[in-house]
Amino acid sequence: DWHPISEQAGGGWTGWDWNERLFPDYRKFLSYLDEQGVKTTMNLHPADGVRPYEKKYQEFIGRAGIENGKTVEWQGSDKRYVKALFDTHLHPYVDEGVDFWWLDWQQWPKDKRLKDLDNVFWCNYIWFTDMENNGTKRPLLYHRWGGLGNHRYQIGFSGDSYIPWESLRFLPYFNSTASNVLYGYWSHDIGGHQSKRYGTPVEPELYTRAMQMGQYLPIIRSHSTKDPQLNKEPWAFDQTTQRRLSNVINGRYALVPYIYTMARQDYETGISLCRPMYYDYPETEEAYGMKEQYMFGDKMLIAPVTNPVDKESGLAAVKAWLPEGQWLEYETGTMLEGGQTVERLFSMDEYPVYVKAGSIIPYYGKVKNLSGPNQPVIVRVFPGGNEGDFLLYEDNGEDKNYVSEYAT
């Protein structure tokens, strides 16, 4: 909704000017979001190009050296076109407060002039490297998978998935095995993007379980299609579901010191935050068969709930394979012996997370925003094991100096 769509131009999703009916003073709006510590992204569909009604159309075609009066289709292999687009439309928005970009390319796969140039891969490259080469902000891009090697640039958008339990059940395997091609940052429309039948309401139990899994994924993000029945804001649900969703969000914020440290490890080693069991236990046969569980960093094992609760008991049964050694349930502290498969019933307020005995997990208290002053770090020690350590990583979270300026 940030930009208007001209039906005279054939509709579509592309636009470069702000919708002044919804945002009469967009600069003030961006400034307000910044004051609240909220990062801003804008959704772009570059394939339809730049149309004559855009305010900066004349400046754009002048810089690009293009004939006047027609829609200028995307030309990613034309350096002059790309530079003109960024200089006239994108860089000014960054200067005014846009923090990162969300691309959505779903049109023709190859460039129309260079037939071997993949449009998704190339869009990821040029948007990311433009951010890398201009300004002080740390580059961040959200877009589709562009093939092998594309992990260097974007956080992945997995597409407009359907909502059923089968989709949720596939995600642990999908997320963890993506690490085999170094693609550690998949982002999903948590709870699904669309129903198979328009107007089907969100199922609170399924959405809660999806969000609980999202708490233990590299990226937690909820999104859905334009359907009035698919509102996913916590306040759109009953009070019990609101409380559970709030617990997920607070729990995610609390784990940021652990997650951020593991993300730095991913950056340095290529070992993804979310990975299959056989990464950590390659010589154990069971590790190769457990497709519905995964390691979340070095210390935590996640066995997601991917089936609904029993209608009579209100509990869901989950099996988890625990490697050799001692493990503790993250929420209860219950000690369990490894080298076996355990099964337990979980209520809607519980989730199967196991921590290696001897682990040290840093976390925050209750926080509302990570953009403010540094939060006090609390340390939780899980007893057992022979020894335990954790090398905490921190940087300013904003600029490119993380390469050499950080604290451990």
Stretches found by the model and what they are:
Residues D1-Y351, V355-K356, N396-N401:
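Catalytic-domain carbohydrate-binding cleft regions of carbohydrate-active enzymes
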Residues E350-T408:
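Accessory, solvent-exposed terminal regions and/or long lumenal/extracellular loops of proteins
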